[in-house]
Amino acid sequence: TLRSSSAASDVYKRQRSNEDLFIEFCEDFEFNPVIFNSFQSVGDKRLPIYHTNVMMCVATDYVIICLDSIDDKKQRKNVSNFIIESGKKLIEISEKQVESFAGNMLELINENGESILVMSKSAEDSLDENQRNTITNHSRIISCDINTIEVCGGGSTRCMMAEIFLPKK
């Protein structure tokens, strides 16, 4: 996952990624690699989370993340420190909130330069008052009920949108 606004990057150590190639890519494009493993509880097992957009949303001024899904304490601390040192506000969410798609959000910037955080109704409903206040200090929240997509498809709003980081012409 690339975060162009902060020149940072993250990757999971999984069968689907190559750490050496990732580091080389980051060096070539002047990104800072942040490598970690992330898991979710399924029954009595801890199973891998394969996409960062399930447990993390990176916005201009803040990062919403489920640090509890990073089981390795050193990796968790590295991720947390990287976020804080980048100058972004850290907003922690729980695994229960991840199940409600609270990590699957996307920041959009409208034509007036206003930050808008798009999320599902279930994600918004899972936020506590402090989390909601922290977000709304930086972004306007827009949510919609996409329960059918979340239940049948297993994804949420972030999975349905793509970012474009091209300069305006």
Model-derived features with residue positions:
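Single conserved hydrophobic/aromatic residue that forms the stacking wall/gate
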Residues: 1-8, 12
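Short, flexible loop segments at boundaries between secondary-structure elements
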Residues: 40, 140-152
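Solvent-exposed, charged helical/coil patches
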Residues: 13-14, 70
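Internal alpha/beta core interface subdomains
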Residues: 17-18
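Redox- and metal-dependent alpha/beta enzyme cores, enriched for Fe-S-associated oxidoreductases
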Residues: 21-133
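Conserved, well-ordered active-site substructure
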Residues: 100-112, 117, 151-169
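Histidine-centered active-site/metal-ligand motif
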Residues: 1, 51, 159
